[in-house]
Each structure stands twice: as C-alpha cells, then as structure tokens.
Amino acid sequence: MFSALLTAISACTAVTATVENDASLPFVELQGYKFHVRTFGDKNLPPLIVVHGGPGGDSKYLYPLQSLAKSHHVVFYDQRGTGLSPRVDKQSLTLQSSLEDLHLIVNHYGNNKPVRILGHSWGGMLVMGYLGQHPERISHAVVVEPGILNAQSAQAFVTRFKASQSWLDALPMLKYILTTPFISSHDGHERFDYVMTRLMNRAKPGGPYQCEGEAMPDNAFERAGFDAFNNMLKPVLDKPEMFTENLLQNIESYKGELLMLSSSCSFIGFDYQNEFHMPHLPAQTKHLKANNMGHNMLTLNADWSTQQLQQFFQ
C-alpha cells in the first residue's frame, strides 16, 4: 500500500522533461542550443513569432493563438532555460541574452525578410527592446502589457505589484515545497521548477492581473523555469533600482506597424501603459483597449484577440 501511495504521489508531482531528456519533443537548434518550438501553418505564409511571458514562463498558455495559422506560419518557442527548452547555467540567463536569442529565432524563421512578432507581458518587454536593436527585422509588432520598459516603470511596477500582494498568497508555496522530495530529477532543476509551475498554475481569480471572477485555466503552463525568474525578475522585485536597462532606447528608429494591446482590468493595463510607456513610443503606434478583459486576454478571450490581430496584420 505504501508503495502504491508513493507511486500515486510521484505521478501527481511529475515534471515534464525538456527536449534534453525527451527526444520526441520538437525543437530547433541554433548556435548549439535546442529551443523547444511548436509551429502551426504553412511555412510559405508570413512568419509570426510569438514571445511568451515570464521570465520563467512557457509558450503553452498562448497556444489559443494558433488559429492565426490560417494566415501565418505561427512560431511558439520556449525561451532559454524555461518551458521545455534545456536548463542552463543561471548566469547566462539575462535580459540581453534573451534579446540575442530572440534575434536567433527571428533570423532562422525570417529567411532574410522582415517578420511579424507578438510579445505578451515579459515577452512584450523583449519585443520592445528588440525593435530598438533590430528595427529592420520586423514589419508588424504587437506588444501586450509590458510591465517594465525603463527605470521609471520598474519603480511603478514593483510598487503596484507589492501593494496587491498578501502574505496569504505565499501559503500554497509551503505545501508545494513539502512535496518536492517526491519529485524525480533528471536535469537537476525539476524541484524548483515544480514549485514555480504550481504557483503559476494556481489560477487565482481576479486582481491584480485579471477581472473579478476571471482566472487562467488549470495547467495553462507546462513547466516554469525558476532560474530564469530568479535571475532576471526577482532582483528587480526586491530592489526596482536594479533594473537599469532602457528597452525604449532607439525605439524611434522602428518604422513598421506597432500595436499596443492592453486591458481594462490589469494593474499594468490601459491606464498604466498610457502613463508610463505610450508617451515614448513611435507616432504610428496604435493603442487598443480590451474592455472587460484582463492581462491574459490572449488566452481567456482568444476569439476577440485573434480577430483584432488579424485586422492589424492585414
């Protein structure tokens, strides 16, 4: 009976293997690193690169956007060190390395032509930084509620985020930590990743990100990357002055189409973007408000979102 109990516990705490330990997973190898990717649509259609949130998230929660494959070759990739991409030395996980990886993905799927790109949350931060560094590589860009783009919004983000938190939010973590001894380890990162994945999949309804009564679906995320979060965002949450990047640098050189999509319910939604980010963006930027929606409208309101995106990409 004890053996059966252990088996049941292990099954409930299994952590999905990365491409390093599961040869059946699709990947693209670029400069010696295997990024987990899933693509949808005809390869001859215009490529659309989808950049997920985090840092430390994965692309699974954005798969409802695969309906855009009717008109695009849609590329979802898990960023280095998170999702189902292999784990790496945490010191190599930086904002700049994330931008360099994005450049690898764009060059691989762009076939020497400008691509279309969509970034959500942290992914929106990366896209905005990328537009300033490589404006010629993108024809159409969509950014969805980037939390931090410069030192000013870093301070605002952290202040507002902490104001929305309660010590009760940390209680589930203890339960997850107590479960970690039962987790099998192959790459040495499963236990911390398990705790973070469970926290991300708690689907807490309402604020600070969603509308009242609204929550992400169960198991929206496949596997979090704790080191990515711990190395890139946690230091900023502890001390916002640690964020010294200016992701708006050279943004005026981007001449392509640009859509900012933000919600009415999220604490970094429409009003936040208008106050901290929109004044710095190019004149051609369109700002679309998702009324009665929250931060994850791409997942929870996929039909509306894809309709707006299709219109923008026309």
What are these model-derived regions, one by one?
Residues 33-87:
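Conserved HGGG/HGGXW glycine-rich cap/lid loop of the alpha/beta-hydrolase fold
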Residues 143-184:
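Flexible "cap/lid" loop of the alpha/beta hydrolase fold
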Residues 250-255, 259-290:
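Conserved loop-alpha-helix segment in the C-terminal half of the alpha/beta-hydrolase fold
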Residues 174-261:
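Alpha/beta-hydrolase
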